[in-house]
């Protein structure tokens, strides 16, 4: 069993609560993504699971075993860092084998495990090279290889793709997902990038200021956000938030949320707004405009003709309602 359970976990630094009573159950063999802005506490949670940070209150279980007071090396986890953390003077083979050598595993077993990991990660021809002779993507694969040979119960990954360029990030996203399918092990992945979260996770944990805002599948997080934070964090461009009374008196005291792709032209009920900026993004066009003091955007086909003003319409089914004070979703 490689499940991970957090029960009322808190982290306090200098009397400041950084993680505030987090409850989370991560299933065996699940790929779960912790996502949120910088400073939300996602990396702190990961480090507490790893044992690199002490927890102030609560319990962490890996499998059925409480690990609060267990040393990191005895938790049967592997940590993949943002910086790769490779030894520059060692070859790829030596870097991958390092953890096994420290555990005094016999040479034949080490060689077998290194070869297997190199095959999985397409690194066989690079085993005798040093990190400086590799690309960023190859270095990241070496870091993954060092984790694979340990055969851990749980993989912990802290922003592992943030140092790569956009093209490599896309490639490595699919490689990590394939790796998860091959290894059938629990993966806990931290990122600030909502695209990574939506494309990689079986479930997503959205965090803000040390609190879990929502835990759900990517589809549910996108289509059924529980509050304005989740609705605004996931989606590009982000959801439009409009004072309800600007649209209709019946929405007084509410915030109306509308995804940019749901702002359409040519509907039955429409209003005209002055265009601020237009951005062409290949097959799409993003049009920015204001509704009262609310900055809004519409995602339209690139062929849409845009002048000084635009007529926008919205279907009632595409409107989200939020309580203005609590910011929680209102379901009708």
Where are these regions (language model features)?
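The feature captures the beta-strand-to-loop junction immediately N-terminal to the Walker
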Residues: 35-37
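Non-catalytic connector elements of ABC transporters
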Residues: 237, 249-332
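ABC ATPase nucleotide-binding domains
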Residues: 70-227
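Conserved ABC transporter NBD signature motif
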Residues: 58-66
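Conserved coupling/switch loops of ABC nucleotide-binding domains, chiefly the family-specific signature
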Residues: 56-59, 109, 209, 319
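Helix-to-loop junction immediately C-terminal to a conserved catalytic motif
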Residues: 50
């Amino acid at each position: 069993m490689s499940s991970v359970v957090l029960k009322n976990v808190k982290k306090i630094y200098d009397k400041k609560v950084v993680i505030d009573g987090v409850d989370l159950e991560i299933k065996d063999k699940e790929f779960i993504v912790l996502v949120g802005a910088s400073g939300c506490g996602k990396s702190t949670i990961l480090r507490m699971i790893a044992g690199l940070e002490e927890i102030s209150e609560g319990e962490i279980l890996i499998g059925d075993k409480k690990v609060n007071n267990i040393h990191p090396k005895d938790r049967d986890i592997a940590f993949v860092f943002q910086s790769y953390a490779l030894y520059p003077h060692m070859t790829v083979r030596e870097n991958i084998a390092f953890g096994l050598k420290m555990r005094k595993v016999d040479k034949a077993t080490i060689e077998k495990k290194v070869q297997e990991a190199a095959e999985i990660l397409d690194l066989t021809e690079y085993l005798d090279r040093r990190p400086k002779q590799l690309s960023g993507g190859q270095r990241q694969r070496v870091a993954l290889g060092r984790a694979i040979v340990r055969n851990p119960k749980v993989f912990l990954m802290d922003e592992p793709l943030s140092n790569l360029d956009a093209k490599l990030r896309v490639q490595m996203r699919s490689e990590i997902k394939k790796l998860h399918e091959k290894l059938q092990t629990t993966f806990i992945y931290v990122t600030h990038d909502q695209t990574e979260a939506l494309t990689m996770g079986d479930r997503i944990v959205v965090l803000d200021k040390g609190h879990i805002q929502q835990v759900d599948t990517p589809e549910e997080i996108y289509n059924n956000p529980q509050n304005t934070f989740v609705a605004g964090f996931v989606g590009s461009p982000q959801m439009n938030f409009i004072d309800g009374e600007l649209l209709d008196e019946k929405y007084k005291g509410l915030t109306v949320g509308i995804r940019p792709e749901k702002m359409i032209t040519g509907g039955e009920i429409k209003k005209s707004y002055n265009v601020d900026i237009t951005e062409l993004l290949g097959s799409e066009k993003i049009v920015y405009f204001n509704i009262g003091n609310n900055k809004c955007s519409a995602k339209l086909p690139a062929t849409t003709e845009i002048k000084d003003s635009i007529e926008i319409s919205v279907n009632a089914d595409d409107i989200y309602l939020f309580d203005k004070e609590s910011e929680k979703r209102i379901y009708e």
